[in-house]
Amino acid sequence: MGDLITIERHVLESQKDHPGATGEFTKLLYDVAFAAKLVYRHVVRAGLVDILGSAGSTNVQGEEVKKLDLFANEQFTKAIGHHGRFAVMASEENEDIILPPLDKYGKYVLLFDPLDGSSNIDANVSVGTIFSIFKRKSDAGGPGTLEDCLQKGAEQVASGYVIYGSSVMLVYTTGQGVHGFTLDPSIGEFLLSHENIKTPKRGKIYSMNEGYYRYFDDGIKKYIKYLQQEDKASKRPYSARYIGSCVADFHRNLLYGGIFIYPRTAKSPKGKLRLMYEANPLAFICEQAGGRASNGRERILDIKPTELHQRTPLFIGSEEDVKIAEEFEQGLRDIEHDEALCPKSLTSE
């Protein structure tokens, strides 16, 4: 058996490249991993302990809250908020920012989606937790502020996700590559299983909810037709794979290559996914793995948020696939002759 590397050891060893490190960041990530174990313990027992189904309420997004959503949100808030490592937190499930219960405020900011894909819980489909970590901008010593949370994704110091499937895997980046850890339930530790993950430059999978086809812009409709055309040179047609759990679809495409798209629609002109809780953390991971992420026109990590629960379209995955999708979205490409068109501003008069 090879050397067993826990997530705590992995982060500690990476601290050698940062002489000013105090160890707080390592403990912080370990807190996240611990909270994920608590959630997993209940995810696998959900049908036995009466936490499946609806809680009879809606969250700030206007979505029906599942019982396990509430449990996961509570576990992350409690497990992480009581150690004084954070100045402020924000959850997809809470309307306002969350301040630590103690008078000790740390230097980090945590934003998280406690249970992504929760609409699939009752069907026993993979769900996950997504998190994003920033350094506070406000003065140290006091509570964090809303402005601490409204930072560009490019300012993240770490992001990651945990996927609860046939096995439990935690994937994270601190801007020095992407690493995956699989939970060994016999010892209760996340062990390094996927070191320095790199996503293929181009894949053969596209993931999107084509049930909304009638609401898509013409550029996206053309892109779908492009993916379905047969062309051996570009390895088309692509295979459609859509789970309906963003983190699960992203995880598969990260490993095998491909693109996940949740575009703007006539029903959701600003997009559907949350910039702070889903798009930013996944975009950071994707870029660190060699991929690309945008809203179809602008790099996700360059978007300056103006509100806590801001939504955005999302094009994320293999670099070449995302670039082609962006060209269709921007009207720079057409399936009629399958080639990039000159921008309208450059067209000869």
From Swiss-Prot:
Record key words, sorted: Calvin cycle, Carbohydrate metabolism, Cytoplasm, Hydrolase, Magnesium, Metal-binding
Cytoplasm listed as a keyword: yes
Residues that, per the record, bind Mg(2+) 1: E92, D113, L115
Top EC category: hydrolase
One GO CC term, this protein: cytosol
Biological processes per GO annotation: fructose 1,6-bisphosphate metabolic process; fructose 6-phosphate metabolic process; fructose metabolic process; gluconeogenesis; reductive pentose-phosphate cycle; sucrose biosynthetic process
Pathway annotation from the record: Carbohydrate biosynthesis; Calvin cycle
Source superkingdom: Bacteria
Compartments, record wording: Cytoplasm
Binding site for Mg(2+) 2: D113, D116, E278
The reaction(s) this protein catalyses: beta-D-fructose 1,6-bisphosphate + H2O = beta-D-fructose 6-phosphate + phosphate
Positions bound to substrate: D116, G117, S118, S119, N209, Y242, K272
Molecular function (Gene Ontology), one example: magnesium ion binding
Main location (coarse class): cytoplasm
Enzyme nomenclature, EC number: 3.1.3.11
Gene3D superfamilies in UniProt: 3.40.190.80, Fructose-1,6-Bisphosphatase, subunit A, domain 1
Keyword Cell inner membrane: no
Pfam families: FBPase, FBPase_C
Family of this protein: Belongs to the FBPase class 1 family.
Subunit structure: Homotetramer.
Cited NCBIfam families: PRK09293.1-1
Protein name: Fructose-1,6-bisphosphatase class 1
Organism the protein comes from: Chloroherpeton thalassium (strain ATCC 35110 / GB-78)
